[in-house]
């Protein structure tokens, strides 16, 4: 079966963005005027997903509200002739059907993925997992991953090729050398978490996109919890590899924005704003003036 269900883990506290995230989930912080989770949902929908399962904590249900219609607001905007604004608030509900899976305790990414199993239909044999802290641009890597799964079966992971001196910040793939699979597609032999540059088996590191065969749920039930009782998705994938399940990776050669800390988020916000036809020209001029030493409202 083709991809039908996409999963977005969104149960985290967003502590790096406090105090804002006391009341606003990090996933709803906007890049220009669009929350990151809507951008991720658009990527999933473009890859063919019809359902978005948002894994969230019991006190963080407001994320799902972004994907629900608000008839009163819609009527008000129609009455006032604000068609552009109306189109913006209809975009998320029209993208994809969203629902919630509750993660009662934050016990790792593997645990978050495991919470989704009750949401699936019997014939859901694959899910996409998209981490909302990672924006992979331009869209398209999920479609390529789906093609690889159609050809080879099993699970498919997204990888980035980084400079060797940076590998110690990531999980690094150990891969088979098989040129017959084509450029940027490799079978995974294993994974090493945050190795030193000298010990890393490659410079291919895990990115925030996974296309997982349903067998991953059984694997998650059989792995040993780590520190704090957490279940790591990488451990479940490693078990699949060990037991002979096909696991491949696709190297993403496009751009990536990490949104997990304020500095990275600001870089992404500037990038998106400069690309925005409405706001980009003015912002570019403003930034150039700052660089030229023409002053700031803050000094």
Ranges and model annotations:
Residues 36-39, 111-115, 236:
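Well-ordered alpha-helical segments embedded in enzymatic catalytic cores
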Residues 63-65, 73-76, 83, 87-177, ...:
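Conserved beta-loop-beta/alpha segment of the NTase-like Rossmann-fold superfamily
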Residues 1-6, 281-288:
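Positively charged, low-complexity intrinsically disordered leader regions
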Residues 283-299:
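Intrinsic disorder at enzyme termini
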Residues 128, 142, 146-150, 178-285:
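Catalytic-core segments of class I nucleotidyltransferases/pyrophosphorylases
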Residues 2-79, 84, 103, 140-143:
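N-terminal glycine-rich phosphate-binding loop and ensuing alpha1 helix
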Residues 5, 50-52, 126, 154-155, ...:
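Residues at the starts of beta-strands that form the adenosine-phosphate
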